[in-house]
Regions:
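Loop-helix junctions at membrane interfaces
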Residues: 1-195
Length: 195
């Protein structure tokens, strides 16, 4: 495959993953909370990890961040957080991709992809809960530290669920997609150096 075709295919796959992250974030169940507003279960984190595994840290992070930020821009509950979401969800893809590329050398096995997703999910949960405590609860809503702590703790179950689902499903999807791309001889576009 010529270099121009590889670049174009990588761009197309990146755009497709932006759309999948967006759609995965739309598939949600919003839960009202007694303190701190709301929480939600969604499938966006699966696609963020998938983006990092398939595209590597930089392109995968871009797809994860952009798809998630676009979702935030379409929802009045989250529109003000779109720039923060771009960074935090982008980091989800960057971490999944960095672990998969640097540690596992893109070895397409379920354990390698699962460990990459675990690292990304745990990192994201910590970042998300810290953002919830400091930014959402204390800064925006003016809560005391104890009320902010309660609001943050109420978001732990949905965060763990979203992370757990991503840990199970993202590697399975990545394995299937990589296999299909390999059979179609299109996997070359995913493996060039991160330029």
């Amino acid at each position: 495959m010529r270099q121009e075709h590889k670049k174009l295919l990588r761009l197309v796959i990146t755009a497709l993953l932006v759309a999948l992250v967006f759609c995965g974030s739309k598939i949600e169940v919003v839960l009202p909370l007694s303190v701190g507003g709301y929480s939600r279960f969604h499938l966006g984190n699966i696609m963020c990890a998938l983006s990092g595994i398939l595209l590597g840290p930089w392109w995968g992070g871009l797809a994860a961040g952009l798809g998630s930020a676009l979702y935030d821009c379409t929802n009045v509950l989250y529109i003000t957080e779109a720039p923060i979401t771009f960074v935090t969800k982008g980091l989800y893809g960057v971490i999944a991709g960095a672990v998969f590329v640097a540690v596992f050398r893109r070895k397409a096995t379920y354990p390698a992809m699962a460990v990459s997703t675990v690292c990304a999910a745990v990192s994201y949960i910590i970042i998300y809960l810290a953002k919830t405590f400091f930014y959402n609860s204390m800064l925006l809503e003016g809560m005391s530290a104890s009320a902010a702590w309660v609001a943050t703790v109420l978001k732990v179950p949905s965060s763990l669920f979203n992370g757990g689902v991503a840990i199970v499903l993202a590697p399975l999807l990545a394995f299937a997609v990589l296999r299909a791309l390999r059979m179609a001889r299109l996997d070359d576009a995913l493996n060039p150096s991160e330029k």
